[in-house]
Amino acid sequence: MSAFMERASGVLMPVSSLPGPYGIGGFGWNAYDFVDFLASCKQHYWQILPLTTTSYGDSPYQSFSARAGNPNFIDFAELIEAGYLEQRDIDGVYLGSDPSNVDYGAIFGGRRQILDRAAERFAADKPADFDDFIQANEDWLIPYCEFMTVKEECGLKAFWEWPAELRTRGEASAKVCADHPARMLYHQMTQYFFDRQWSRLKAYANDRDILIIGDLPIYVSRDSVEMWATPELFKIDAAGNPVSVAGTPPDQFSATGQYWGNPIYDWDAMESDGFSWWEGRIRAALDMYDVIRLDHFRGFEAYWEVPFSSPDSSYGSWTQGPGLKFFKTLEEKLGTPPIIAEDLGFLTPGVIDMRDNSGFPGMKILQFAFEGTNSYYLPHNYIANTVAYVGTHDNETARGWFEGTATPRQREQAALYTHQQAGEPITDALNRTIAASVSDTCIYTMQDLLNLGNEARINTPATLGGNWTWRMLDGAITRELEHKLTDWTETYFRIPSEAEIELPQ
């Protein structure tokens, strides 16, 4: 296995955080404008968060499906142009009142109301390629649409709260779906629109030399079509409940650790058929994205396993994962997949060996570096085969950290290390430092480019509510920002065609 990334840079910007008129960022003209911004500043990557459906809590890392796209990102303007919506279908529907934040409660009902109107017209006038789409994706699409149809008929309850005969996919669930064809068609339609709109947007980005870094969560949600339709993939008991769930151990941030609640895979069963489910999942992700950030990479070496009945994550223990043989098997089937290893958190020699032997670039977070020691995260300790960030979606913004939780000692070290100039925002100094680093790739967060505080933080791990809501305001990107980002890119040779090192003659 070998490294694949060139010396370049990009921006982390969730699709949900784009501006736009329909309550949440999506695949409309604002997304195309964002691609144009990246291209004008000579960026090479647009990193996004998972595009899959979200469930309770609105987290893209807790989805009803590992494969289905999020209907919230469907652009209504395209549906108007195609004749499936009229402007009057949208006018008067409440989708939230604050353009800087997503109101998930509002869009849950409002966008569904609008898409229901589109579905009525769609039923009478399906696109010519709709049946081809269904046939090409039936392995995951049909189970997903059945799962969502039954879920809606059961009042949106978690599937283990459904009537007993519906808790596994079979004849009873098939009858429910046969009795409600309009619901089935609705979910097929939204996946069709999602696929076609995303494919066009990605092609537009690729044509401008912008590659998409997608995000692949390691786990699926307990309330997911995978647990319902393919329970054999997981460690479950006779009643269909998880034997154990995922989390993280106690650390300096939490005395009880993090209780994620995701079901644990039956890795032995997966290995017995050559990890075919994962092969399909990675193959699909590579169709959707150009590069994959593989979340919780250390979980493939060893994962924190918590007994299902435990009150918190402190009752868990480490269990060996499939290790390097998993990635070797993928390589045999897929070639060398372009994967970024999210190798943050508790690292052991085993995790480091697995990452290094895989050849995947790891991640460096500058915000973690300033502890008064020769930290692993200080840029002079980086290697080329890494991706450098000031912070990610799980961190405070740079300004929020520096003005808030950073200690005086951390602030002093950060200012000195980054050579912060008089009057220079600390966000610029930190961004400039990762741009100058030896890491092949550096990724800026959009909030840090805009010098925003923690009001723009995307997610605070182990908390509920107030996450995943930030949106960039229309017009926030200025010529000054474009010039600054271009200057960093050119100064530190992060344009792939110009990045080759010239040796002395």
Question: Model-found features: residue ranges?
Answer:
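Catalytic domains of carbohydrate-active enzymes, especially glycoside hydrolases
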Residues: F4, W29-T54, D287-Y289
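Conserved, well-ordered alpha-helix/loop/beta-strand core segments that scaffold catalytic motifs
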Residues: H187, Q191-V220
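Outer-envelope exported proteins of Gram-negative bacteria
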Residues: L49, L211-I213, P217, V291, ...
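Alpha-amylase-like alpha-glycosidases and glucanotransferases acting on alpha-linked glucans and related
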Residues: S2-R7, P14, D58-D195, V220-I443, ...
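Aromatic/hydrophobic pocket-lining residues that form π-stacking "cages" and hydrophobic walls in ligand
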Residues: F34, L201, V351
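Structured C-terminal cap/extension of enzyme domains
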Residues: N451-Q505
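N-terminal catalytic cores of NTP/NDP-binding nucleotidyl/phosphoryl-transfer enzymes
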Residues: G10, P14-D33
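Surface-exposed amphipathic alpha-helices with a cationic face
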Residues: A39, W198-R208, E331, R355-D356
